[in-house]
Amino acid sequence: MNFDYRLATINDIDEIMIAVEDARALLKEEGNGQWQFGYPNRQDFINDINNQNLYVVLSSDTHEIASVCAITGYEEAYMHMYEGKWLTDYDYLVMHRVAVKEKYRGQGYGKALFKVFIEVGKKKGIKSLRIDTHKNNSLLIHLFDLFGFVYCGKAILPPDKDRVMYEKVLD
């Protein structure tokens, strides 16, 4: 699948929030408490936009926003795994707040976000990518596995508490 991506702008916020609400509804439908208690919210995404950390993938036909993720740097909570350890001590990027609009599910736009994550890491000269999720988020964990992320352990991250942690070392 060919796709375009770019940094999000403040003009994208309403479209981004549609993807977020679609993802929130899917998590709830699957019995996953992740994203059910006010996080992430509109202001979190506005902050990501202002910090130039929020990326959007555009649909190949209409060029509207199909999926979204934040790509950030150092994460203090990642230093405090209570089980396991990271593969490396390299500088790293983290992907957070992954969401795909309902009408684009199953069309490769979640995979596209991981391709963006890897490409951004390589462009920035980063050797390690890290990501976490709720232990019951099977769709996201499937993508971690598909893209070669390795399970490293568990950590406590608010607001969902217990998180599973993964890392991918870039070539």
Language-model regions: role of each:
Residues 70-97, 105:
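Conserved acyl-donor/pantetheine-binding loop and adjacent beta-alpha core of acyl/acetyltransferases
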